[in-house]
C-alpha cells in the first residue's frame, strides 16, 4: 500500500506516545485519521482538538465509515494492543492492510537521512535534544519523538527543506529493525524486554543486527564501554562517546548553583563554555551524544552552544513541577533499574542535604519478575520509597509477582510504604516532604496534578502555622 495515496488511517492504540506522532503526521498530510485508545488522556484530547477522531470503547460500530474501505485505509497497530482486540479482529477478517507502528515509521523515513537514537535508556531525551539542535539551526529537521518536547509542545516536528529525520529507535518487539539509519547513537544495552527476547544474549544480538542497518557513508556513535560488538557495513564510521572519555566527550565540567557548564570535545573541534538548559548531570552524557550527531552533520559550533542552552527538556523526563525553597516535586519516566539509579543519583547531586522521597509504580509484571532485586537496589539509594501496584500495560498478572517483591528487598532502615494509586494523597498528608519524585512509565503521571496541588496546600498550611 502506498502511504502517499491512502485516504484514511486508523490507529488501534492511538494515544501511545509513538503512535500519536504518526497520528499528527498523517493529519498534517490531510488524511482522515481516527482510532481507538483505552482511556482519555491529555494527549488524546489534544489529538482530537487537532482533528483526529478517537473513541475509548472497543466497538467496531464506532469505527468511522471513512475508515471502512480496505482499498484506501491503512490500519496501524501498536504492540501494546492484544491480538484478540475486537476492532483488530474486524480489520484482520476483512482483509485490511495492517502494519505495526515501526513499519509505518520505517516507510515514511526511508527516503530521508535518518538520525536515530537507540538504547535501553536515555534515548527519548537524547533524540529530543538532537531534534532541537537541528530544528533551531540553519539545517532544520523532521522528528518523530518518544516524548513531548517542552520547547515545541509536541512529539512531531516537520520541515519542508531538511533532508534529516530524527527518530527515537525503539528496541521493543525489535521495532528498530524496520529503520534505515543514516547515523545512529546507541546509548545503552542493559537487558530489558526479556518477555520478548528471552535472554540477554538475544537482546544484544538484536542491537548487533540493528547496527548492520546503518547506511554506508553514515556513522555509529556508541557509548564507550557498553557490551556490544557492532557489525556495521563497509563505509560506516564508528565513534565512541561518554561523559568523560571517547571520541566525543565533555571536559571542564562545572556544576553549581543550579547550573551546569561544560566544554564539548570532538575529534576535530572543541566548543567551550556550553550551558545546559536542563541542568541535571545525566544530561551531560545525553548532550554529548546529541552534539556529536549535530556536529557530524553540519550544525555550527555557535548553533550547538545556543541550542543546548535553549533546550527545555521533555515531559516526564526530570520534569520539575514545583521548585522552591520549601519543596521540590518532579516527575520522571524512569522504569528500568539503571534509569532509576541514574535519576536518583542526579537528584542526590542537586539536593544532597535534603530528604528524597519517591513514589514508584513498577511497569509490567515480567519486568518486575526479572529485575525486582535490581529495582530494590536502585530505590534503596533514596531516603523514602512509596510503592504502588504494578502497571500491567499489555500484560496479564503473574502469580506471586507484585510490588511487594521490591518492597521486601529494600535496604534495612529505609522508610517505606505500599498503597494503591488512589491512596497516594492520603499517604502524603502525614509525611514531611522535602524532595518528591514520581517514577514510572505507567499512568502514575495522571496523579501528578493532584499531588502538586496537595504539596502546595501542605506547604501553605505549614507557613501559616509558623506565622
Model-identified regions with their sequence ranges:
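Short internal beta-strands
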Residues: 31-38, 220-224, 357-360, 382-392
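Phosphate-binding loop of NTP-binding sites
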Residues: 25-31, 62-68, 79-222, 228-237, ...
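Short acidic/histidine-rich motifs immediately flanking catalytic phosphotransfer sites
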Residues: 68-74, 163, 432-434
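Beta-strand->loop->alpha-helix junctions that form or flank phosphate-binding loops
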Residues: 36-37, 55-60, 99-103, 144-146, ...
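Short, basic, low-complexity termini and linkers enriched in Ser/Thr/Gly/Pro
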Residues: 268-270, 432, 456-467
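Nucleotide phosphate-binding/pyrophosphate-handling subdomain across enzymes
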Residues: 2-8, 18, 25-29, 256-258, ...
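C-terminal helical cap/extension that packs against the catalytic core
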Residues: 50, 237, 376-434
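N-terminal leader/targeting and accessory segments in enzymes
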Residues: 1-100, 104, 219, 249, ...
